[in-house]
């Protein structure tokens, strides 16, 4: 256990995130040595927030204790390793009125202290946010050269050379694609299908086993169509730039249900400005010829066939009820039916997977030659089975390193694919990232739009989250973003669909 004691609540979330990057296996608990009055009523950032008795409480069970004291324009940081009594201290001067600069200075000081004490560095430095390419994109939009952007990312965040080069390269490709999009007069549409054949061990997304909900799928589509009607009416004067049907696993729907849903979308919206219509077919065990034909005849331009790995033993461990041959056959079937923009998702850091296993997976993927490959770093959330039943998986190694990511990048390059979007998540194996690779002209527009947060995305369905991006930028060049979420529970979504629509009405009626 790691304990952090603050003399007042400030930047706890940032400190907590950085410590979890360095020490992912440790439980990080936050305490305050200030009076209860200074904490009461504040929106505290971390789950564990307790008061020390008198500011000098002993933490005998803690392996490490950090103390962070804010005094005027100075911050004192003290790090004690209880096992050997080693203590490291530092003090920095800040302009406390500039919160962004103060936060960055604190994180740099904390990072440098831990790096010196452990000899460990992080590939992304102090960056713990999920969208590191947004920073590189902002630098490019501000007219900074590659060298100036590199220096800024290195000095401000201590990111590694490899990650800086990756960010700059992706930001340039994103900008070229996004220049085609009318942010002010356009929007994108997400449709959520929350059903799955089964729940994977690593998954925390909102999903419901189809076997349990099979008799209510049409009720769900009835409610979804009602939300689609509202969206089409509200945005009739806007340009619809991209559509993404995700989940869950959309191909748990029957061919007739898929046809019903897509025809509803096509009848409700003007698609003349739509650059991309994606359906995440996803699980190979949910894909059939009839379902692919329903997608093809309705003009779907991009699909996913997601193996996650091509090692059967791993598929069995994580609860994927399909075989390696199922993946190959589903992919071949999609090609046979004329799909020319197919993505494949792979996950690094799965239980018991070695570098040779990854090489085997990439060899088989290379033989299939998909148009997109998305390399995910395993990020296990609290709601995932790998966490809830962690004792079952405690003896299994889950390793992801720069070597794994470099191997995948090399194979993608051999396939003629270039990195075009990137994002990170909390708790990623090896402190790595998710990277999307694509052939020329096959990049996923929706993926870039949702990461860069430059355009409103209207999301329909259980658990879907709508983001309204305001067109007028803030003084720092960022845009105000407001959100509303639909309830996750399928039964509640069906019963309360009118309330879900009212939430959207309130979000978009604000001036």
Residue ranges of predicted features:
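Radical SAM enzyme core and accessory elements
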Residues: 1-146, 224, 440-511
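Key residue(s) within conserved catalytic/signature motifs
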Residues: 11, 169-170, 202, 279
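A C-terminal junction/extension of Radical SAM enzymes
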Residues: 26-32, 46, 383-460
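Short beta-strand motif preference
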Residues: 77-79, 191, 305
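N-terminal [4Fe-4S]-dependent radical SAM core
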Residues: 118-121, 141-189
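Canonical Radical SAM [4Fe-4S] cluster-binding loop centered on the CxxxCxxC motif
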Residues: 184-219
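Beta-strand scaffold of nucleotide-dependent catalytic cores
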Residues: 192, 304, 373-377, 448, ...
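Conserved non-cysteine loop/helix-boundary elements of the Radical SAM core domain that shape
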Residues: 207-408
């Amino acid at each position: 256990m790691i304990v952090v004691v603050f003399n007042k609540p400030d930047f706890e979330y940032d400190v907590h995130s950085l410590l979890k990057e360095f020490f992912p296996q440790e439980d990080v608990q936050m305490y305050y040595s200030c009076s209860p009055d200074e904490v009461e009523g504040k929106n505290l950032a971390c789950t564990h927030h307790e008061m020390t008795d008198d500011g000098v409480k002993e933490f005998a069970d803690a392996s490490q204790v950090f103390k962070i004291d804010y005094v005027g324009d100075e911050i004192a940081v003290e790090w004690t390793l209880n096992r050997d009594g080693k203590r490291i201290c530092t003090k920095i001067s800040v302009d406390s009125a500039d919160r962004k600069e103060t936060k960055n200075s604190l994180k740099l000081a904390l990072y440098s202290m831990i790096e010196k004490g452990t000899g460990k560095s992080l590939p992304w430095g102090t960056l713990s946010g999920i969208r590191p390419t947004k920073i590189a994109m902002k630098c490019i939009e501000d007219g900074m050269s590659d060298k100036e952007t590199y220096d800024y990312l290195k000095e401000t965040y201590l990111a590694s050379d490899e990650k800086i080069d990756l960010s700059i390269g992706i930001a340039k490709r994103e900008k070229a694609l996004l220049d085609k999009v009318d942010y002010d007069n356009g929007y994108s549409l997400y449709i959520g299908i929350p059903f799955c054949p089964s729940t994977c061990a690593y998954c925390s997304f909102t999903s419901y086993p189809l076997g349990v909900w099979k008799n209510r799928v049409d009720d769900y589509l009835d409610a979804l169509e009602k939300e689609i009607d509202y969206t089409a009416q509200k945005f009739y004067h806007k340009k619809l730039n991209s559509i993404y049907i995700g989940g869950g696993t959309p191909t748990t729907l029957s061919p007739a249900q898929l046809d019903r849903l897509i025809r509803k979308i096509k009848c409700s919206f003007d698609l003349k400005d739509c650059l991309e219509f994606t359906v995440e077919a996803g699980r190979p065990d949910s894909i059939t010829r009839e379902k692919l034909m329903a997608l093809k005849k309705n003009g779907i331009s991009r699909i996913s066939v997601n193996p996650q790995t091509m090692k059967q033993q791993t598929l069995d461990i994580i609860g994927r009820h399909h075989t390696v041959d199922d993946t190959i056959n589903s992919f071949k079937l999609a090609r046979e039916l004329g799909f020319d923009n197919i993505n494949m998702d792979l996950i690094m850091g799965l239980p018991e997977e070695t570098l040779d296993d990854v090489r085997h997976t990439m060899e088989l993927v290379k033989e299939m030659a998909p148009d997109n490959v998305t390399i995910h770093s395993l990020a296990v959330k609290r709601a995932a089975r790998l966490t809830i039943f962690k004792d079952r998986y405690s003896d299994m190694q889950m390793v992801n390193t720069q070597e794994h990511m470099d191997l995948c990048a090399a194979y993608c390059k051999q396939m003629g694919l270039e990195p075009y979007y990137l994002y990170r998540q909390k708790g990623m194996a090896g402190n790595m990232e998710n990277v999307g690779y694509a052939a020329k002209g096959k990049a996923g527009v929706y993926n870039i739009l949702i990461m860069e947060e430059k355009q409103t995305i209207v999301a329909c369905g259980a658990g879907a989250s709508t983001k309204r991006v305001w067109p007028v930028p803030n003084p720092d060049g960022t845009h105000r973003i407001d959100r509303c979420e639909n309830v996750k529970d399928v039964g509640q979504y069906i019963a309360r669909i009118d309330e879900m629509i009212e939430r959207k009405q309130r979000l978009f009626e604000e001036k």
